[in-house]
Amino acid sequence: MSIKIAPESNKISSLEVVVCRPLYTESLILDVVDTSRIEGEILNTEHVRSSIAKKLGLEHSEFIQTPRHIDGIVDVILDATQNFERTLTKERLLGWHHSLFQSGYSGYTPIDVAQYRTGGMKVISGNFGKEKIHFIAPAADKVPLEMDSFLEWINNDQEHDLVLKALIAHFWF
């Protein structure tokens, strides 16, 4: 099997479909499952597999009814990986947020969906009364300007390749 990458587009220009499709599908399944695991959510791999197969139009011997939140996570991962060359906009990001929190809740906590946050945000760990603060996010009133700056950079930076931009974006927020 030969793999040719067109340097001007960072795209694989030829692969055997017989090998590529199953590898791509398994990679997507791992992306969805592992991304969710990082956030503390353990997903049923067969639900993820079925959702991906349906959305990609693949034949799958056991299509099963998938929970709405799994379909939402799959939608986000598919959009991010298949449409990475599209401009990243506020509307697209908020659409992803809506896909992830379709119920309007994060656990048992109601949240404002598909809009920038309006309150404070901290990343903490530890038991109640012994919390450790790892990060305090910028004030809510600064979020629109910070997001505009980020979107300007992510869409217009030509200095960095896509992998490095993804790493920088991860640390930006």
Which residue ranges define each predicted feature?
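FIC/Doc superfamily catalytic core
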Residues: 1-173
